[in-house]
């Protein structure tokens, strides 16, 4: 009768498991900010400033879209101005012909 000793063989990982993470993604940039410079000539309907909220207010001949984007209502020259002590506004002044 043969008696065999069976070895107690245990295998362990030689590298840590990869695991998972809840990070690793980012939202796309929204390209907010000034789209026309002070003194620049623009046509009617041109976007002047893209923003979230009213960082800059609409002035003369400037409209505000549903997402607070400021756009020119007429063709003219863009002017970024102060509105009171602590606010800013953008206006478009028509070019005299």
Curated annotation (Swiss-Prot):
InterPro entries: Ribosomal_bL27, Ribosomal_bL27_CS. Residues 14-36 are annotated as: Disordered. It holds the Pfam family Ribosomal_L27. Keywords: Ribonucleoprotein, Ribosomal protein. GO terms for biological process: translation. PROSITE patterns: RIBOSOMAL_L27. The keyword Ribonucleoprotein applies. The keyword Mitochondrion does not apply. GO terms for cellular component: cytosolic large ribosomal subunit. One of its GO terms (molecular function) is structural constituent of ribosome. Belongs to the bacterial ribosomal protein bL27 family. This is Large ribosomal subunit protein bL27. The gene is rpmA.
């Amino acid at each position: 009768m043969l008696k065999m000793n069976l070895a107690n063989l245990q295998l362990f990982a030689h590298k840590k498991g990869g695991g998972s993470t809840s990070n690793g993604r980012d939202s796309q940039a929204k390209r907010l900010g000034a789209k026309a410079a002070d003194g620049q000539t623009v046509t009617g309907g041109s976007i002047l400033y893209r923003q979230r909220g009213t960082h800059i207010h609409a002035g003369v001949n400037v409209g505000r879209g549903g997402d607070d984007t400021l756009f020119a209502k007429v063709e003219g020259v863009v002017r970024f101005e102060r509105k009171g002590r602590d606010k800013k506004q953008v206006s478009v002044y028509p070019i005299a012909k």
